[in-house]
């Protein structure tokens, strides 16, 4: 039988992993500095916004196209 401290350590680590909130899956949206913000802040905001939009709207390769028919033969081969 394993030592008692090993099982307590395993229990503590698993509870710690459950207690930690999960991270965000993507970047956070930049906050608008306001209409009366200096030009440098507005430039920084628009650059951050462009980078955010590039990440959020990037192409995701490996997904099936919606135009593909489910019953279609692979590689266009004729069925039996």
From Swiss-Prot:
It is found in: Secreted. Residues 65-80 form a propeptide. GO terms for biological process: feeding behavior; neuropeptide signaling pathway. GO terms for molecular function: neuropeptide hormone activity; neuropeptide Y receptor binding. Residues 1-25 form the signal peptide. Keywords: Amidation, Cleavage on pair of basic residues, Hormone, Secreted, Signal. InterPro entries: Pancreatic_hormone-like, Pancreatic_hormone-like_CS. PROSITE patterns: PANCREATIC_HORMONE_1, PANCREATIC_HORMONE_2. Hormone secreted by pancreatic cells that acts as a regulator of pancreatic and gastrointestinal functions. This is Pancreatic polypeptide. It comes from Gallus gallus. The lineage of its organism: Eukaryota, Metazoa, Chordata, Craniata, Vertebrata.
């Amino acid at each position: 039988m394993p030592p008692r401290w090993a099982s307590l350590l395993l229990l503590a680590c698993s509870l710690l992993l459950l207690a930690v909130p999960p991270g965000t899956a993507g970047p956070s949206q930049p906050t608008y500095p306001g209409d009366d913000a200096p030009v440098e802040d507005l430039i920084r905001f628009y650059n951050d916004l462009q980078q955010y939009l590039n990440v959020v709207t990037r192409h995701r390769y490996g997904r099936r196209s919606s135009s593909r028919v489910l019953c279609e033969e692979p590689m266009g081969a004729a069925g039996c």
